């Protein structure tokens, strides 16, 4: 009873005021420490408490003992071209000029985001130049391997199958990234002027083109 009487006096109001001020200060502090995740991105927090990933909501970052970086999870494109002298060699040794666009992004799973952050870094993870370094050779090899399964005319008439088999050849193991889609942007026969007669494969291709052209003239 005495305590309640004391709190009802000037001292009580002072204690209440200080308490409210402290609570208000804590709320303001927590709000300033709260980092909301931008759309299409993730926040990776390091420091005390270990590595934490926020994808949809937000996360508290305490200055001085914790740090954070933002990682872009949006889709990036990588275009692989095989043109002219480097045209894709088909099963019948006819070359094809082709451009394939790959749509790649970081997988929206905590384990994959951590893997990419630790191995590549948040800032470089979605940089187009970095993605080319990581995947250009793999994607180019997939195009080359799959293209060799088709004769040129079959390849030209079966773009969807060509596309599907390229994606299957690349697979799902992209070390934290995923191949979301691919698109055959351009596909035409390589001009015969770029083929080399002293190249065995090109010589076979020239022979095949000559035969097909002759057949078309007869028709």
PLM regions and their residue ranges:
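Short, strongly hydrophobic alpha-helical membrane anchors
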Residues: 1-10
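Single-pass alpha-helical transmembrane signal-anchor segments
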Residues: 11-31
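Aromatic-capped interface at the extracytoplasmic side
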Residues: 27-41
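Transmembrane alpha-helical segments that serve as helix-helix packing and pore/cofactor-lining elements
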Residues: 33-35, 73, 88-89
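Membrane-cytosol interface motif
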Residues: 39-61
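Solvent-exposed beta-hairpin/edge-strand motifs
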Residues: 59-69
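Edge strands and adjacent loops of beta-rich recognition modules
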Residues: 68-82
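Elongated, amphipathic alpha-helices that form coiled-coils and helical stalk/scaffold elements used
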Residues: 79-219
